[in-house]
UniProtKB/Swiss-Prot annotation:
Entry-linked InterPro entries: Ribosomal_bS20 (IPR002583), Ribosomal_bS20_sf (IPR036510)
Full protein name: Small ribosomal subunit protein bS20
Function: Binds directly to 16S ribosomal RNA.
Species per Swiss-Prot/TrEMBL record: Acidovorax ebreus (strain TPSY) (Diaphorobacter sp. (strain TPSY))
Family the entry assigns: Belongs to the bacterial ribosomal protein bS20 family.
Length: 100
């Protein structure tokens, strides 16, 4: 049996070859940013679960930056980025209120 994906034909035109090259680069960049997003969110949630208010606040600021970047580049919709920031912010604020 053949493997999962069928083999794609090579583009004939120069513009098609260029788009294929660009697609590979963009895919790698998007995958990297998506991974950075997941890591940032996980780190904030770990800090919240551990009850470390200062670390959670610090990591949340970094996560906000990553979320904004991803929304600006169009990897995630801006509403999804805003929703994720809001939910993370609520968790960090709840931790701050519980500590007070």
């Amino acid at each position: 049996m053949a493997s999962g994906k069928p083999k794609k034909k090579n583009p004939r035109l120069a513009s098609g070859r260029k788009r294929a090259r660009q697609g590979l680069k963009l895919n790698a960049a998007n995958t990297s940013l998506r991974s950075k997003y997941r890591t940032a969110v996980k780190n904030v949630e770990k800090a919240v679960l551990a009850g470390d208010k200062t670390k959670a606040t610090e990591l949340f600021a970094k996560a906000q930056s990553v979320l904004d970047t991803i929304a600006d580049k169009g990897i995630f919709h801006k509403n999804k980025a805003a929703r994720d920031k809001s939910r993370l912010s609520a968790k960090v604020k709840a931790l701050a209120l519980a500590a007070a």
